[in-house]
Design a protein with these regions (language model features):
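Generic N-terminal targeting/processing segments that precede catalytic cores or assembly contacts
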Residues: 2-181
Length: 182
């Protein structure tokens, strides 16, 4: 039996499901907020984020903190009506100075795993932060700094964490993929 909803066979009308955001989009917003605070001393709230398709949503901050040479922002993930295990999770990003000439580096914070087996799009030993979120984070850090296309990336260390991420990841494929710690 095929249901007809929203004018298309077998598909629900878009108005029936509430859209949400990926963990990567939430991490991007938190990173941009933290870096903006490092640059200006103020956390933007809401935080604008430019997505790869050109959309510019805003994200509300859940928490913020700043210390000598670092800033941290937290976004509560809203996955919409998607049955995402990380819905409601706190996505925490700390931005601090990186290696001179090293561009943007990534570190796994509490609840974000580390890749331990080959076969994923990132090398063994890297934090399990996928290539697209890395690209989005770097692009939004560049926007926050007002860098033009020719300027090198800022030298920053971006540490991404997920509250209770290790427990959440145990319910996913991460352990079978060799991602340990979240």
């Amino acid at each position: 039996m095929t249901e007809q909803r929203g004018g298309r066979r077998g598909q629900l009308a878009s108005s029936e499901l509430r859209p949400g955001w990926t963990t990567g989009a939430c991490a991007t917003a938190a990173a941009r907020a933290a870096y903006t605070a490092l640059l200006t001393g103020q956390f933007p709230d809401p935080v604008p984020v430019v997505l790869p398709q050109g959309r510019t949503p805003t994200f509300a901050l859940t928490a913020e903190a700043q210390g000598e040479g670092w800033a941290e922002a937290v976004i509560t993930k809203d996955a919409g009506d998607d049955p995402d295990i990380t819905h409601g999770a706190l996505v925490r990003v700390r931005v601090s100075a990186g290696e001179p000439g090293g561009g943007v580096g990534f570190r796994a914070g509490a609840g974000v795993g580390t890749i331990t087996l080959p076969g994923l799009p990132l090398p063994v030993g890297e934090p399990a932060i996928n290539p697209m979120p890395r690209t989005m984070i770097i692009a939004n850090l560049r926007l926050a700094a007002g860098l033009d296309a020719e300027a090198p990336d800022p030298d920053l260390l971006v540490t991404v964490g997920i509250n209770d991420g290790e427990q959440l990841a145990a319910k996913t494929l991460n352990p079978r993929l060799g991602i340990v710690g979240g």
